[in-house]
Amino acid sequence: MSGVVRSSPGSSQPPPPPPHHPPSSPVPVTSTPVIPPIRRHLAFASTKPPFHPSDDYHRFNPSSLSNNNDRSFVHGCGVVDREEDAVVVRSPSRKRKATMDMVVAPSNNGFTSSGFTNIPSSPCQTPRKGGRVNIKSKAKGNKSTPQTPISTNAGSPITLTPSGSCRYDSSLGLLTKKFVNLIKQAKDGMLDLNKAAETLEVQKRRIYDITNVLEGIDLIEKPFKNRILWKGVDACPGDEDADVSVLQLQAEIENLALEEQALDNQIRQTEERLRDLSENEKNQKWLFVTEEDIKSLPGFQNQTLIAVKAPHGTTLEVPDPDEAADHPQRRYRIILRSTMGPIDVYLVSEFEGKFEDTNGSGAAPPACLPIASSSGSTGHHDIEALTVDNPETAIVSHDHPHPQPGDTSDLNYLQEQVGGMLKITPSDVENDESDYWLLSNAEISMTDIWKTDSGIDWDYGIADVSTPPPGMGEIAPTAVDSTPR
């Protein structure tokens, strides 16, 4: 269509009807155009909402249409007949009713729905084709705020209440805090679980979950059924001094943390100084300690000190001396094992204490011992000899109730004097053959095992059997086993 005819702002009145002439009389000729009767057509159903009520009809003045006879008017919601005198807008009333019901929907309590309150109702605004989609989008935008029911009482103030509880409100952590606060408010720290469940408005199984955890970490105890007692700070959380004690403990923890940090700094500085000292080639000749340096340490005063030089991974075992049930006397042993290399053992210092015998008299220890005996041992206790049987194992295995200076050859070990310290060297006998009491090798005789000096005369009289030669070593009588194998 070529154009749109607009109505004048003045009042629009219908034109006067044309004069009716009888068919026999001739039609007078006038200067004004003849307006034909209005042809009514059925309007097509429109999918767009109407701009105005369907019962209203707008008609234009003939004067405004005198120069626009061939134009037509198109409206978004109706169909316009191509007339020369008027434009009629029609829209189906059923469509308008359905649309208006959708736009304005009164709620049950007399208020309009919050999702449709912002929809314009002015007839001058044209809704889009996707008007229903816009309504959904606005309703979706308002979904973030909870819709609360509005009271019908107009005089009461409108209050907003949450539609649902938060997840944190029902969490076990928050419930535990509330439960501990109840214990603090309880008298003498005693709380009834039934009353706690009623106060907190939770099930008892939730209370039991909390009490099981607190009882597991030793904060509460159950002296009676369904009653708990606090065992935390000051044994009673209801005291007023509990908060003060907690603050004191926190301050003490901070002070200890500062002291620990200072000690860590000192350790780090000392390690750096030792590293610089050891890595410097000029200081290699000073990298040693003497026996006096070791004995002068405060922790080694009045102690028997045995130094062990062993590779990394060496294990040291000291069995209980009372576990040797097959031996009548207590046995003190030190067992060293290593698979990475040889083990060196030194007797650095020997404690010169008094040893008490069975009669209670004090006597000084022998002048020369294979190794130092345990401090405070009696005459019935064994003085052990530490031997290194092979580069992998060092075992204290020999019993010597009454040691003498000449008995070192009978124990099959060698000792070297190194710079004032006594070094214990490995034995010639292998580890598997060190237990000579149970040795069953037929090639080794008893004479070879108990070898002494070659000048000893074994052919002496029968009467002299009870008196051994003066050069022969003493043998423990309980150690001989004459049972043939």
UniProtKB/Swiss-Prot annotation:
Residues 1-69, 114-159 are annotated as: Disordered. Residues 114-125, 142-159 have a biased composition (Polar residues). Residues 245-286 form a coiled coil. Residues 129-141 have a biased composition (Basic residues). It holds the Pfam family E2F_CC-MB. Residues 249-277 are annotated as: Leucine-zipper. It is found in: Cytoplasm; Nucleus. GO terms for molecular function: DNA binding; protein dimerization activity; RNA polymerase II cis-regulatory region sequence-specific DNA binding. Residues 435-450 are annotated as: Retinoblastoma protein binding. The keyword Chaperone does not apply. The keyword NAD does not apply. Belongs to the E2F/DP family. The C-terminal region (366-485) is required for transactivational activity. The N-terminal region (92-128) is important for nuclear localization. Transcription activator that binds DNA cooperatively with DP proteins through the E2 recognition site, 5'-TTTC[CG]CGC-3' found in the promoter region of a number of genes whose products are involved in cell cycle regulation or in DNA replication. The binding of retinoblastoma-related proteins represses transactivation. Regulates gene expression both positively and negatively. Activates the expression of E2FB. Involved in the control of cell-cycle progression from G1 to S phase. Stimulates cell proliferation and delays differentiation. This is Transcription factor E2FA. The gene is E2FA.
